[in-house]
Amino acid sequence: MAEVEQKKKRTFKKFTYRGVDLDQLLDMSYEQVMQLYCARQRRRLNRGLRRKQNSLLKRLRKAKKEAPPMEKPEVIKTHLRDMIILPEMVGSMVGVYNGKAFNQVEIKPEMIGHYLGEFSITYKPVKHGRPGIGATHSSRFIPLK
């Protein structure tokens, strides 16, 4: 019976970003983390974060600190679609503007190194219906309703 209980125990894959686990990423300095990023992200962070991006990080830190333990922090709305997701942002809730509304995004460890805009689609994907009159040569033979 004890063997059956041991088999039921699920093991989850521990998250690593380029071979470094999340706890170590959080302890690293920006310069050390930058070396793990792709060239585009490295170049962007090397040029420095602007005032708006620093204020977003500050607001995310504050929301995380004020959140009760074991609960998600409040959503912080932003227009900064070009913000690179940093390890310290993991666990935060961000409302990313898509040009019409704020899409709520929970930042997970797998998102590190990506841009916020990648998780808030700006267009409505096309749902193709039936072709209309004159759409193609063969559409002349499609009966009208």
UniProtKB/Swiss-Prot annotation:
Predominant localisation class: cytoplasm
GO cellular component, one term: cytosolic small ribosomal subunit
Pfam families in alphabetical order: Ribosomal_S19
SUPFAM superfamilies, alphabetized: Ribosomal protein S19 (SSF54570)
Keyword Ribosomal protein among UniProt keywords: yes
An example Gene Ontology biological process: translation
Taxonomic superkingdom: Eukaryota
Keyword annotations: Cytoplasm, Ribonucleoprotein, Ribosomal protein
A GO molecular-function descriptor: structural constituent of ribosome
Compartments where found: Cytoplasm
Subunit structure: Component of the small ribosomal subunit.
Family according to the record: Belongs to the universal ribosomal protein uS19 family.
Function: Component of the small ribosomal subunit. The ribosome is a large ribonucleoprotein complex responsible for the synthesis of proteins in the cell.
NCBIfam families to which the protein is assigned, alphabetical: PRK04038.1 (NF003121), uS19_arch (TIGR01025)
The protein's name in its UniProt record: Small ribosomal subunit protein uS19
Gene name of this polypeptide: rps15
